Amino acid sequence: MTEVLRVGQPAPDFTATAIVDQSFQTVKLSTYRGKYLVLFFYPLDFTFVCPTEIIAFSDRHSEFTALDTEVVGISVDSEFSHLAWIQTERKMGGIGNINYPLVSDLKKEISQAYNVLEPDAGIALRGLFIIDREGILQYATVNNLSFGRSVDETLRVLKAIRHVQSHPNEVCPVDWQEGDKTMIPDPEKAKTYFETVAEP
């Protein structure tokens, strides 16, 4: 029986082969302890929505590293398929060189552990997870296969997580962006925030 994946609990560890800088390397979740990690699953190589997501995260990779965050992509394809896709030009449907590892989950064990495996199709749904420096799952979202995710929203949530972890007496309200007002979760102290957003 698969354990229930819960925000606030340790993220399931894994060890797998990945493509890193066009070479085969072993990647472990525990390697990223001490940094934040954006871990995202996608259905298959050589498809349609998937390359748009992978390229977008790669092109904005520096924005994640500036936040002490690594990015890792995972699908049920083999590492050989990942490599072939990376070595295919973007104009031909490939992804070209990317700035983070692509992990092979050929046995589908990682997808199962993160509860994103679509059993009938045998592929992963578009799950995205943000794991903190202690290896604790802080955020989880899963899309159906036909629509992609937002790099902007991932960065927004990541910044909110970092903020509340460095300011544990504060919480971030709806649509919070870096630099916006936060609130203190206390009936009296929260009034300071609500007074600033109240309708005239």
UniProtKB/Swiss-Prot annotation:
Residues 5-163 form the Thioredoxin domain. It catalyses: a hydroperoxide + [thioredoxin]-dithiol = an alcohol + [thioredoxin]-disulfide + H2O. Its EC number is 1.11.1.24. GO terms for molecular function: thioredoxin peroxidase activity. GO terms for biological process: cell redox homeostasis; cellular response to oxidative stress. The active site is at C50. Its main location: cytoplasm. The keyword Cytoplasm applies. GO terms for cellular component: cytoplasm. Keywords: Antioxidant, Cytoplasm, Disulfide bond, Oxidoreductase, Peroxidase, Redox-active center. CDD domains: PRX_Typ2cys. InterPro entries: AhpC/TSA, Peroxiredoxin, Peroxiredoxin_AhpC-typ, Peroxiredoxin_C, Thioredoxin-like_sf, Thioredoxin_domain. It comes from the Bacteria. It is found in: Cytoplasm. It is an enzyme of class 1 (oxidoreductase). The active site is a conserved redox-active cysteine residue, the peroxidatic cysteine (C(P)), which makes the nucleophilic attack on the peroxide substrate. The peroxide oxidizes the C(P)-SH to cysteine sulfenic acid (C(P)-SOH), which then reacts with another cysteine residue, the resolving cysteine (C(R)), to form a disulfide bridge. The disulfide is subsequently reduced by an appropriate electron donor to complete the catalytic cycle. In this typical 2-Cys peroxiredoxin, C(R) is provided by the other dimeric subunit to form an intersubunit disulfide. Thiol-specific peroxidase that catalyzes the reduction of hydrogen peroxide and organic hydroperoxides to water and alcohols, respectively. Plays a role in cell protection against oxidative stress by detoxifying peroxides. Belongs to the peroxiredoxin family. AhpC/Prx1 subfamily. Homodimer; disulfide-linked, upon oxidation. This is Putative peroxiredoxin sll0755.
